[in-house]
């Protein structure tokens, strides 16, 4: 299992490396990512760059089903089409302190990726799945949802989180 990095850890700003080899080592990493995901409370998804690992790969694991029985692994994913806009509150496993803020993202997306075994996949997503994928792909590019907020809002959150860290609450 991996440790989930916490903001402001500078490794959260690291861009992931594309996956070139779909081997046993990759399968083990993906299994550990899902193990970490399922062990975390209220976790919808995780990107490799959120985890304490060397050379994080371009991988995200998603499962927000009630029984945690619908795992989705996206490797080298990219959004190839976007439409509409939707603004909704987001939180993040790497940003503690009960931090939720409104973020505007595409309402509908088309994704091209590979599954965990290297098989090409392409699909459309909307609603929570679209938001989740965009949030995780941001992570894989070194962007956290706080980066999408105004400077003023981000400053207030940084100040509040700093105080909580000093109190040992995050």
UniProtKB/Swiss-Prot annotation:
<dbReference type="GO" id="GO:0006412">
    <property type="term" value="P:translation"/>
</dbReference>
<dbReference type="GO" id="GO:0042586">
    <property type="term" value="F:peptide deformylase activity"/>
</dbReference>
<keyword id="KW-0378">Hydrolase</keyword>
<protein>
    <recommendedName>
        <fullName>Peptide deformylase 1</fullName>
        <ecNumber>3.5.1.88</ecNumber>
    </recommendedName>
</protein>
<keyword id="KW-0648">Protein biosynthesis</keyword>
<feature type="binding site">
    <location>
        <position position="92"/>
    </location>
    <ligand>
        <name>Fe cation</name>
    </ligand>
</feature>
<dbReference type="InterPro" id="IPR036821">
    <property type="entry name" value="Peptide_deformylase_sf"/>
</dbReference>
<keyword id="KW-0479">Metal-binding</keyword>
<dbReference type="InterPro" id="IPR023635">
    <property type="entry name" value="Peptide_deformylase"/>
</dbReference>
<feature type="active site">
    <location>
        <position position="136"/>
    </location>
</feature>
<comment type="function">
    <text>Removes the formyl group from the N-terminal Met of newly synthesized proteins. Requires at least a dipeptide for an efficient rate of reaction. N-terminal L-methionine is a prerequisite for activity but the enzyme has broad specificity at other positions.</text>
</comment>
<feature type="binding site">
    <location>
        <position position="139"/>
    </location>
    <ligand>
        <name>Fe cation</name>
    </ligand>
</feature>
<keyword id="KW-0408">Iron</keyword>
<dbReference type="Pfam" id="PF01327">
    <property type="entry name" value="Pep_deformylase"/>
</dbReference>
<feature type="binding site">
    <location>
        <position position="135"/>
    </location>
    <ligand>
        <name>Fe cation</name>
    </ligand>
</feature>
<comment type="similarity">
    <text>Belongs to the polypeptide deformylase family.</text>
</comment>
<dbReference type="GO" id="GO:0046872">
    <property type="term" value="F:metal ion binding"/>
</dbReference>
<dbReference type="GO" id="GO:0043686">
    <property type="term" value="P:co-translational protein modification"/>
</dbReference>
């Amino acid at each position: 299992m991996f440790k989930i990095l916490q903001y402001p850890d500078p490794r959260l700003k690291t861009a992931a490396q594309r996956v070139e080899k779909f081997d046993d080592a990759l399968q083990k990493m993906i299994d550990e990512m899902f193990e970490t995901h399922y062990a975390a409370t209220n976790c919808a998804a995780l990107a490799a760059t959120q985890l304490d690992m060397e050379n994080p790969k371009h991988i995200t694991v998603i499962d927000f089903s009630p029984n945690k029985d619908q795992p989705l692994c996206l490797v080298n994913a990219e959004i190839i089409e976007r439409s509409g806009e939707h603004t909704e509150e987001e939180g993040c496993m790497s940003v503690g302190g009960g931090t939720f803020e409104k973020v505007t993202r595409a309402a509908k997306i088309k994704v091209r990726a590979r599954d965990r075994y290297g098989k090409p996949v392409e699909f459309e997503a909307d609603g929570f799945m679209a938001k989740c994928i965009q949030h995780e792909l941001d992570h894989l590019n070194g962007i956290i949802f706080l980066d999408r907020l105004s400077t003023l809002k981000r400053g207030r959150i940084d100040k509040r989180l700093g105080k909580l860290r000093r109190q040992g609450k995050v």
